[in-house]
Amino acid sequence: MKRRGMALGLAALMTCTALFTTTAKAENKGSDEKETIKFTYWGSGDEKKAIEESVDKFMEANPNIEVDLMHIPSEDFLTKLNAMIAAGEAPDVSYSASWKCQMGEDGLIYNFYDLLDDMGLSKDDYLSTCWWNWSPTESAGPVQANVTTNLMYNVDCFEEAGVDLPPTKVEEAWSWDEFVEMAQKLTLDTEGRNAADPDFDANNIKQYGVMFGTDWNVYMPFILSAGGGYLDESMDGLGLNDEKSAQILQNFADLINVYHVSPTAVQKNAMPSAATALAAKQTAMYIDGSWNHLDLMNSGCNWGVGVLPIDENYTTFFDGGSLIIFKSTKHLEASEKLYLWLTNPESSERITELYRTLWMPVQTEYYTDPDKIDFWASEELPARPEGFQDAIVKATYDHAVVATEINVKNFNEINLLCYFK
C-alpha cells in the first residue's frame, strides 16, 4: 500500500471534533437487518480490483454487512477525507498515512489498543517496529500490510549486458561504487554504447541503468546505514543536511548529473511507473517500494529482486499505512470484522493473493515460522522471484528499525518540505 506526501489540513477540522463522539458497539441488530459501512482506500488499478474482489468475498461471508467502497487517488486522498469529516460523513474504516496520528490526537479515530480484546488480538502478535502510536498508550494500530524498499530489475537487461545479477544476500551486497559501476554498464545510448564508454552520448539515452523513487523511503535506508538520520541527534532539528546524510543524497544526485545512469526529475516525470519502465527496458534497475511487485507480476517483465547496495551496517525497515476506524461509526462490530478480514493473510483466497503479491504480513509468525513464510513468500509464487526470501523477507526482518514516518512526529508536514520530486 503506497503512501504519498499529502498536505495535512486537520487544524481546520478541530471545530468539527464534536461531531465525533465515542460510539459504543453497534446496537444489536435483527438477524435480517443489513448494516452498511463505508471504506475509503487508494491504490493502483490492480490494487483497486483486488480490494473490490476481496470485499465482495467479505460480504459473501458476512451477508448482513454491506461495504460501500470509495476509491480515492492517493494524491487527493487526505483532501477528500478532510472534506468528508467536515461534512459529518467520515468513513467507518479507511486507509491512512502518517497524518492519522494527528487524527488520533484530535479524538477522531479509535485507540487501537482499546479494540484489541474485542477483536481477539494481542500486541505481541505483531512486529514490534510496526505500530503507529501517537502516545505511549494510544495507537492508530499496527501497519495494515507491510511494504519495504527494494531493488527490482529486468533480468533480460542484465543478461544482454553480460552483467551479474544483483546479490540477494546482505553479506554479498554491492558497495555503492560497485552499484554505480553496474549501472554504467546497463545504461545504453541510442547507438548501444554504455555509460562507461568514452563515446557514450548522455543526451540520447534509450535505457537507463537505474531509476529510483524520490520519496523518503528510498534514501532513508542508505542514510540510516551510513549513521545519519532524518532528524539530528538532539531530535529537534533536521538531520538530512548533516555530513553523512548529505553525502547519501549527493550520491543519488550524482547518478543523474555525474554518471548519467538515471533520468533527471523532469525526464522521470514523463516516464511511466516502475513496473512499466522495467518491462519496457527504459531502465534496468529500479529502487522503490515492494508495492510494485503486483504490477511487475502483471507486466510480463522477466524481473527479479536484490538487496539494496549497502555493504556495511545494512539497515532498512518495514512500513505501511494502517486501517483506522473512526469514532463516528455506528457499526463498530462490522468495522472490526472488515479490519480482521483485510489484515488476516488467510481470511480468504483473494486476501491470500494480496499478501502473495502486493502486501507483506505484519504478524510476527509469518517471519519466524518456516511454513508460514512459505505460505506467502514461496519462490514458486509468480510475484516472489528467485531470491525473494533472502533479499526481501530475511534482509528486512533481520535488519529492520522503526520506519522514519512512524518514528518522527509531524512527519507529514516535515516531509512535504523535504520531498525531492
Question: Whereabouts are the PLM-identified features?
Answer:
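Short, low-complexity disordered leader/linker segments with a strong preference
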Residues: M1-K38, E60
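Glycine-centered hinge/linker elements that transmit conformational signals in sensory
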Residues: V180-Q184, S234-Q267, M297, L308
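Hinge/lid segment of periplasmic solute-binding proteins
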Residues: A97-N150, D177, A196-N204, F212, ...
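Short, solvent-exposed loop/beta-turn-alpha elements that line the ligand-binding surface or hinge
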Residues: Y113-Y126, T168-E172, F200-G209, G228-I248, ...
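Extracytoplasmic "Venus flytrap"/periplasmic binding protein-like
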Residues: S54-Y126, D156-P166, T276-A279, A284-M285
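Extracytoplasmic/periplasmic solute-binding protein
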Residues: S135-Q144, T149, E159, S175-L238
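Short, well-ordered beta-strand elements
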Residues: E33-S44, I65-M70, D92-V93, A140, ...
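Mature extracytoplasmic/periplasmic domains
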Residues: K57, L294, G321-K409
